């Protein structure tokens, strides 16, 4: 019996497959955090020329972040196929070949790096490329399959967007950018461990040494609580350093108290539903915190 002929894929469907490789929702948050870094680096409203630089910088960061996401899909296609939340990815479903995905990733990386180098500044390009290497190679290939601390160490790459944004506008990496980096770095572990808690069986089947798999639920929940407490303190630093004023402080305290509350509840009385709510609130926490920084920046 002869094999069935391959199913033709329309151009729009193929484009959607390539777009899905870039993990658009993740990249949107990355670009948003980079944008906050750009805007905070500029006193007052950006000029027309600065808005142009912001646009090019956002485009460059989006392209390189998308390239890293696509490369990640190649490396983790076997793992993605075993996990419900990632089984839809085109590489996991066999809709795109490794060669197609690798070429797509390379094109995005080259295009984004060129935009940043020629239309923003070389420092931003090199920092963005280092972030690509940190995520795609050091985190995805080395840390993630090796250690349950993968999220902690690899979180440095995920915390880079505001640093990239700051460098894009100032051609330097100031202490303000490092404060923003620290906030995201400390936010990352409780965010991902909350997800891993209610997806623990999927991670166990995938073979990834996530903390709930290697150290159990109780230990992971304690770590979530501890990190939310440390994060609460870190989120006060923009006010202490003079980057922001009282409106931001009020937002930071409320959001931090909410995240700590979820962490405490999760530690005391676990349920998958509560872990899912904690994960979702973590997204609200980071987005609202950076939005508060932005609004505070323009208050008289």
UniProtKB/Swiss-Prot annotation:
Cell wall biogenesis/degradation in keyword set: no
Miscellaneous comment as given in the Swiss-Prot or TrEMBL entry: Carbon 2 of the heme B porphyrin ring is defined according to the Fischer nomenclature.
GO molecular function: protoheme IX farnesyltransferase activity
PROSITE patterns (UniProt xref): UBIA
Any Pfam family the entry gives: UbiA
Keywords, in A-Z order: Cell inner membrane, Cell membrane, Heme biosynthesis, Membrane, Transferase, Transmembrane, Transmembrane helix
Chief localization: membrane
Compartment(s) of residence: Cell inner membrane
Source organism phylogeny: Bacteria, Pseudomonadati, Pseudomonadota, Betaproteobacteria, Burkholderiales
Naturally occurring in which organism (per UniProt): Verminephrobacter eiseniae (strain EF01-2)
Name used for this protein in its record: Protoheme IX farnesyltransferase
Its EC number(s): 2.5.1.141
Topological type in the membrane: Multi-pass membrane protein
Family: Belongs to the UbiA prenyltransferase family. Protoheme IX farnesyltransferase subfamily.
Keyword Acetylation attributed: no
Family matches, as CDD domains: PT_UbiA_Cox10
GO biological process, one term: heme O biosynthetic process
Highest taxon of the lineage: Bacteria
Protein's pathway: Porphyrin-containing compound metabolism; heme O biosynthesis; heme O from protoheme: step 1/1
InterPro entries hit by this protein: GPCR_Rhodpsn_7TM (IPR017452), Protohaem_IX_farnesylTrfase (IPR006369), UbiA_prenyltransferase (IPR000537), UbiA_prenylTrfase_CS (IPR030470), UbiA_sf (IPR044878)
Transmembrane segments: 26-46, 54-74, 102-122, 123-143, 150-170, 177-197, 224-244, 246-266, 279-299
Function, in words: Converts heme B (protoheme IX) to heme O by substitution of the vinyl group on carbon 2 of heme B porphyrin ring with a hydroxyethyl farnesyl side group.
A GO cellular-component term linked to this record: plasma membrane
Reactions performed catalytically: heme b + (2E,6E)-farnesyl diphosphate + H2O = Fe(II)-heme o + diphosphate
HAMAP family tied to this protein: CyoE_CtaB
């Amino acid at each position: 019996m002869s094999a069935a002929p391959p199913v033709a894929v329309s151009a729009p469907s193929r484009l959607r497959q390539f777009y899905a490789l870039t993990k658009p929702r993740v990249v949107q948050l990355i670009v948003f955090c980079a944008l906050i870094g750009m805007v905070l680096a500029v006193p007052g409203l950006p000029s027309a020329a600065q808005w142009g630089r912001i646009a090019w910088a956002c485009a460059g960061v989006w392209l390189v972040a998308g390239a890293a996401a696509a490369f990640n899909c190649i490396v983790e296609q076997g793992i993605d196929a075993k996990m419900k939340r990632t089984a839809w990815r085109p590489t996991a479903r066999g809709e795109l070949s490794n060669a197609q995905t690798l070429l797509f990733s390379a094109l995005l990386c080259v295009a984004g790096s060129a935009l940043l180098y020629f239309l923003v500044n070389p420092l931003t390009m090199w920092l963005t490329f280092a972030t690509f290497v940190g995520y795609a190679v050091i985190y995805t290939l080395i840390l993630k399959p090796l250690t349950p601390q993968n999220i902690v160490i690899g979180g440095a790459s995920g915390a880079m967007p505001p640093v990239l944004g700051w460098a894009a506008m100032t051609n330097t990496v100031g202490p303000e950018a490092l404060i923003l980096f620290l906030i995201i770095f400390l936010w990352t572990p409780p965010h991902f461990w909350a997800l891993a808690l209610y997806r623990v069986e999927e991670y166990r089947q995938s073979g990834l040494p996530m903390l709930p798999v290697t150290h159990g639920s109780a230990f992971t929940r304690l770590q979530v609580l501890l990190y939310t407490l440390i994060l609460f303190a870190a989120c006060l630093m923009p006010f202490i350093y003079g980057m922001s004023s009282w409106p931001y402080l009020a937002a930071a305290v409320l959001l931090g108290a909410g995240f700590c509350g979820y962490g405490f509840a999760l530690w005391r009385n676990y349920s998958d539903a509560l872990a899912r709510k904690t994960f979702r609130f973590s997204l609200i926490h980071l987005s609202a915190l950076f939005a508060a920084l932005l609004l505070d920046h323009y208050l008289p």
